[in-house]
């Protein structure tokens, strides 16, 4: 499947290869594709969640790799149906019953966290970064990728149009930093610069 994807970003390709090597290759990857059924995929996904203890988001990455792989096998007439169809929907439905609702930090929790960082002998130098993250809602890669030209102090705005990512190059032991544009147009945005961020 990966050899047919010429338009994948290097970081996405690296993430898929890492995911395959760490969660699929030595387990599910040893099965013959024609022998795999829906129930096998469901069991494998539950194994990853309950035994390996991966997060639901990581499982989604596994699925984003396996689903199109099986879909390609359907198109190539190796198998008739994609055994991954509907599995994530079932997993998500079951998972949402057992998972609590995520809550953002309260203002008091944010204040306590920032005070802790500011007064900590080791972490105090991270205070400006956490101030930007909390004050903008940026993702970590977006905040790390900010340049002076992205900041407009007169209009009090921050232009988010790229992010910094760190990933291992496929088939190499070298890791690289790379500036890249957001995957979608919605990722390009202008946000207000709060007083504390300024």
Task: Give names to the regions the model predicted.
Residues 2-76, 83, 121-122:
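N-terminal core-binding DNA-recognition domain of tyrosine site-specific recombinases/integrases
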Residues 26, 93-97, 178-184:
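Short glycine/proline-rich turn/loop motifs
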């Amino acid at each position: 499947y990966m050899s047919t994807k010429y338009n994948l970003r290097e970081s996405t390709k690296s993430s898929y290869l890492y995911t395959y090597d760490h969660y699929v290759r030595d387990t599910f990857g040893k099965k013959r594709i024609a022998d795999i059924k829906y129930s096998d995929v469901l069991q494998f996904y539950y194994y990853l969640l309950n035994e390996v203890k991966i997060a639901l988001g990581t499982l989604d990455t596994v699925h984003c790799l396996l689903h199109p792989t099986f879909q390609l096998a359907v198109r190539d007439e190796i198998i008739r149906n994609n055994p991954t169809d509907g599995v994530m929907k079932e997993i998500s439905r079951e998972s949402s019953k057992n998972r609590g609702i995520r809550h953002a930090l309260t203002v008091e929790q944010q204040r306590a966290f920032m005070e802790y960082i500011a007064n900590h002998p080791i972490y105090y130098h991270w205070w400006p970064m956490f101030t930007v993250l909390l004050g903008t809602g940026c993702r970590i890669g977006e905040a790390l990728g900010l340049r002076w030209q992205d900041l407009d102090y007169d209009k009090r705005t921050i232009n988010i149009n790229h992010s910094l990512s760190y990933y291992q190059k496929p088939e190499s032991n070298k890791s690289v930093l790379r500036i890249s544009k957001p995957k979608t147009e919605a990722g390009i945005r202008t946000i207000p610069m709060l007083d504390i961020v300024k």
